[in-house]
Amino acid sequence: MRILAKWLALAVLLCTTPAKAALDIVITEGVDAARPIAVMPFVWQGSGAAPQAIADVVMSDLVRSGTFKPLDELGLPQRNIGTAAQFQANSWSSVGAEALVLGTVKPYGTDQYLVSFDLIDLVKAQNQALKGPVSATEFLMDSRQTVISAAQFRQYGHRISDIVYEKLTGIRGAFLTRISYVVVNHTQKAPYQLMVADYDGVNEQMLLRSPEPLMSPTWSPDGRRLAYVSFENKKAEIFVQDLYTQVRTKVSSFPGINGAPAFSPDGKSLAITLSKDGQPEIYIIDIATKAIKRITNHYAIDTEPSWYPDGKSLIFTSERGGRPQIYRVELSSGKVSRETFEGEWNLGGSITPDGRSMIFVNRTNGKFNIARMDLSTRFMQVLTSTRLDESPSVAPNGTMVIYGTTYQGKQVLAAVSTDGRFKARLPAGQGEVKSPSWSPFL
């Protein structure tokens, strides 16, 4: 119980302070090594000022992906162009970018706008231009038109970013996803807040405010529900809340620990930690029927379950080897195997969506950092150099990890690419933020 007590004490301690309307994103490393891309301001074809700048959203998304570095608009060879027909390949020979995003916006009825965008392969366009005149179809990677409302500009900007990212990398973009996290404001009577925001911290919404700690939010596979732990009734209980109807369902309220919920891949069950039978063990509970099945049975602490993408196995943190390490249990046979061996502690693991890697917290020489292990080669890479890292959550496309850390004595969120090259902080303006969870594709 000694290690679990420390974990629980740390979780309660870190669940304490406030947040502002949105999280900032401060990029700290990795932009210089990113792939150059050109994003032109979308040409406004109406009167007065344009409603919103879609290109700004696209540029910010591509920078935050850690993969691309948009070039300074002032250094681009053409200005005020919005279609591939206006593109002059010869003018771009010295730019050095691999692609160009450009588009137009024009009024299309009451509170409606027609947004058009083109994605141009600059490398191919320049190569073709050396051979003579070329048509736009030879270097156009994508071209789309969509009618949106004034309220949808930012959302559609994320959609364009998703398209661009997938066309250039072959990996689905995750710019239309959301994150959940916990903040606390000790100046209020009900200081603990469960929050949801767009992946970039914009459109922050408070789902729940409580006078007692809230922790461990996690998303359902369809993105409609959050499971979390609440102490609002003076004890640990697990709830599932529908984000659209706001209906809350109490799933687990056994004596002792009710913690660390994780949705099964089909969304019908939760893997949880319960101590109702003595030591903390891993259980699976059916959300609808509340039927439970015990998965582990050991005198040591078993906690922090997480599912393999195929739903056939769980990984979990256990002290059964003397120190916290990550183990795997096959649900059909109950066979348990140890997964981590490097470092002093390894805990809080989750499997990447492709099933090839595991992301977790590694302690080496007393330092807690986020690490990734290739499940086939067992090669481990420490991804971060921040302090007291915890609660890693992987983006649904497997390219980024959001996690909790400490910066200038405060709890903040941070992000790191799964190759360790790109790093950013997401500090709140008023207080501390922790327990992040990245949504599935929405």
From Swiss-Prot:
Q: Which Pfam families match?
A: PD40, TolB_N
Q: What is its main location?
A: periplasm
Q: Which UniProt keywords apply?
A: Cell cycle, Cell division, Periplasm, Signal
What compartments host this protein?
Answer: Periplasm
Q: Does the keyword Glycosyltransferase apply?
A: no
Q: Where is the signal peptide?
A: 1-21
Which processes are annotated in GO (biological process)? cell division; protein import
What GO CC annotations are associated with the protein? periplasmic space
| NCBIfam families on file | propeller_TolB (TIGR02800)
Q: According to its UniProt entry, what is the function of this protein?
A: Part of the Tol-Pal system, which plays a role in outer membrane invagination during cell division and is important for maintaining outer membrane integrity.
What does the subunit section of this Swiss-Prot or TrEMBL entry state?
The Tol-Pal system is composed of five core proteins: the inner membrane proteins TolA, TolQ and TolR, the periplasmic protein TolB and the outer membrane protein Pal. They form a network linking the inner and outer membranes and the peptidoglycan layer.
Identification of the protein by name: Tol-Pal system protein TolB
Organism of derivation: Shewanella baltica (strain OS155 / ATCC BAA-1091)
